Every structure is written in structure tokens, then in C-alpha cells.
Amino acid sequence: DFADAAVGRSLTSLVAAEVKRGKLPGQGPNDVADAAGMVVLAMGKAGAGELNYSSDIDLICLFDDERYADDYAEARAAFIRVTRRMAALLSEPTGDGYVFRTDLRLRPDPSVTPVCLSMDAAERYYESLGRPWERAALIKARVMAGDQKAGQGFLDRLSPFVWRKHLD
């Protein structure tokens, strides 16, 4: 749908710019198609495919830290830039309006974490500190853009957190 296309196009164009600038170590033009390991998860109405004309989009941005074991800090900085620029590109008003209001606050502990964090850090957070409302929010989560395989793998690993056998 339109939201997926808008997020996907903005993500790949911004990742391509970072790759061209050499800011994503070891990544080249062939890595742009899967956003060089970055994933955008759609949450809430966007995740469920229930957007209406006034909906914002709730996104969680992650990157596959296994691809950047040797240059984690540089990759992390590049993905944070991509996320900030993507949110601005989608939500800043122009003469024609804006594409979507974009909310990045559903990520793990948004007051202290960067706008894009590693999948490993997010997974550790959910396993140790995840709250019931986060479990509920992840029910509708889906990979919206970026590295589909890595994103689906992340969601699969979170399945025991989301679908606990016992709620105590």
C-alpha cells in the first residue's frame, strides 16, 4: 500500500546515500535493496493495515548488528541518521502537505534509546524489561520496509515474548 511504498522508497534512498558516502562499512550498491540490514517495523494501525486518512504511522527502526560486528559504532550512527531523515522526509510539511505523521516512540524505552537500535539490543530489552503494553503492541507488528528476512527473523525470535504461555 501507499504507506509501505513511501517508507520503503525513503528508506532505500537514504541508505543508498549512506552507502555512497562510505558510512556503512563493507556495504555496496548491491546491499541497498535490503537497506543494508536496516528494518522498519510497522506497529498499530500501520502494522494491521488499518490506516485511515488521518492516521499517523508508528514505526520501530532496527538494524542487523551481526552485519556490522567490526564497525558497529559507525553503522549505528549511519542508521540513526537514516531514521531521523526518513521521519523528517515523511512528516515535515511542504506546500503540498506531508506524507505521514511519523511516530518513533514505540521503540524500547524511547526516552533513553536512539531512534534506531540494534536488533540484539531490542531483543534483550523485551526479554528482560518488556512490559505488557509492549507485548500487546507487538501483536500487530510486521516488517514494513528494509531487510525482510532479518526483520521477520527478529519478529520470530520475539514470538515467545509476545505469545507467552502464562500471563502473571
For the regions a language model picked out, list residue spans one by one.
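A nucleotide- and high-energy phosphate-metabolite-utilizing enzyme signature
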Residues: D1-D168
